[in-house]
A protein has these predicted regions:
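A short acidic/small-residue loop/turn micro-motif
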Residues: 421-425
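Short, non-transmembrane alpha-helical segments in secretory-pathway proteins
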Residues: 349-381, 430-431
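Thiamine diphosphate
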Residues: 1-86, 95-116
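Short boundary motifs at domain starts and secondary-structure transition points
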Residues: 65, 234-239, 382-383
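Short, flexible turn/loop "capping" segments at secondary-structure junctions
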Residues: 87-90, 238-239
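Short, structured coil segments at secondary-structure junctions
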Residues: 5, 54, 91, 292, ...
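Flexible, low-complexity linker and terminal segments
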Residues: 108, 113-348
Length: 431
């Protein structure tokens, strides 16, 4: 459908090529975007800094999955936040947005392109595998096509005899300089990854002009004031005098809302703060909301609570507790409900292996070592030497006869032993 829609979709040889080609397209005047997951984004980060330096509009989509490295590429997580914040070296203007559902993804993409072109900077949409791949039913008229398109100021010509040399990076009060597409009459300039003066002439080859560097860096970063003013601040959902405030970001919005329904039925007063615009951040507005909350719990899919740390860095506010998940599966409402109740009851959140998890670990061992010829049956907890154990009875898939026992650590999850009751044939099945 590319020709019909006026869109070019290109599969490049690697992530470096993708990022640089998208930036080049944005520089040339095309609305350009590219998408990747965490590993690919790691390779793109130097190029993203180039977009910040040459002030090229471009949109990146970073879909988080379980890491580090290849990790679990078919499972979800929210643990790339530090990487997205730290993309490329140095300070440069950029926007980071975390959409909350499928419909929001559509409008966020439109908004991202408008921001990129209006303010001449890179925009990163940070999603996750759950949001990027799950099916979702929406209303037929939820996605409108009459969306606003804002391309920013693009000059069509530059009368050099009248105005002098074109200053692509003019030091303006707004920080936004006149943009000319390649080939514009009279508007020749140099776009380079080195810092430069107003005409694009580099200031770091032979000598570094510190005053030019300072004013150029201030000019670039001035854009962020206008960007922040344009982005809508977050709003607190629910009763203002709630006993508990659940804080989330990105794709956790739906599951938090559903969990609140169940918590409300239990008699709790719960409200909800969901953050979408991560950079620039509405520090003042968020601080005012949080300091009036009685008890705050941050819900996110990461081990270290990356968003809670970012929240503290931006506002100085530390949430009271964390509800975390990092097994690759998304939150379901009961996960949030159970952990919130445990926190309110003063209980520690257990990381011990549950019976269901022990069954899953038994299935994994069987697939790897026993050629799927058996299955876990009865499971019970017993005492062990260094920790309690899950004793898993293993039976034949077809015969249902006892074939052996697995012992799995309740605390560590370690497979301590497999004890067959008789010698088994574990070669590849003919099926």
């Amino acid at each position: 459908h590319g020709a019909k829609c006026g869109v070019v979709v290109k599969q490049c040889e690697d992530e470096l090529a993708v990022a640089n080609m998208a930036i080049g397209a944005g520089h040339a005047g095309v609305r350009a975007m590219c998408g990747t997951s965490g590993g690919g984004f790691a390779l793109m980060t130097e190029a993203i800094g180039m977009a910040g330096m040459i002030e090229a509009p471009v949109v990146f989509i970073e879909v988080q999955r379980g890491g580090p490295s290849t990790g679990i590429p078919t499972k979800t997580e929210q643990a790339d936040l530090n990487q997205v914040y730290g993309a490329s070296q140095g300070d440069y203007p950029r926007v980071i947005i975390a959409p909350t559902d499928t419909t929001d993804c559509y409008y966020t993409a439109v908004e991202a392109h408008n921001l990129a072109e209006k303010y001449q900077l890179p925009v990163t949409i940070i999603s996750d595998l759950l949001l990027s791949e799950h099916p979702e039913t929406i209303e037929a008229d939820a996605l409108r096509h009459d969306v606003p398109i804002e391309r920013g100021e693009i000059i069509s010509e530059w009368p050099e005899a009248e105005k002098g040399q074109f200053t692509r990076y003019a030091l303006t009060k707004s920080g936004i300089s006149p943009r000319a597409l390649p080939g514009t009459a009279g508007a020749m300039y140099v776009a380079t990854t080195d810092d430069h003066d107003e005409e694009g002439v580099t200031i770091s080859d032979v000598f570094t002009t510190t005053s030019v560097r300072r004013k150029m860096q201030e000019k670039r970063m001035r854009k962020m004031d206008a960007v922040l003013a344009e982005l809508p601040p977050p709003k607190l959902e629910g009763p203002p005098d709630a006993d508990v405030t659940l804080v989330g970001w990105g794709s956790t919005e739906g599951v938090i809302r559903e969990a609140i329904v169940f918590l409300t039925r239990q008699g709790l007063r719960v409200n909800h703060l969901q953050l979408k615009y991560l950079h620039p951040f509405h520090s003042k507005e968020v601080s005012e909301i949080l300091r009036n909350c009685k008890r705050t719990i941050c819900v996110e899919c990461s081990y270290t609570g990356q968003f809670a740390r970012h929240l503290r860095a931006e506002t100085g506010f530390s949430v009271n507790r964390l509800v975390l998940k990092y097994d690759g599966e998304p939150f379901e409402p009961h996960h949030v409900v159970q952990q919130v109740n445990a926190i309110l009851e003063g209980k520690s959140i257990s990381t011990d292996l549950t019976m269901d998890e022990a069954r899953e670990m038994a299935y994994h061992y069987i697939r790897v070592h026993l050629a799927d010829k058996v299955r876990p049956a009865k499971i019970e907890m017993i005492d062990g030497d260094s920790e309690k154990l899950w004793l898993v009875e293993v039976v034949g898939r077809e015969s249902d006869k006892e074939e052996g026992e697995l012992r799995i650590g309740v605390e560590t999850g370690s497979i301590y032993s497999w004890q067959p009751f008789k010698v088994m044939s574990v070669g590849a099945s003919s099926g």
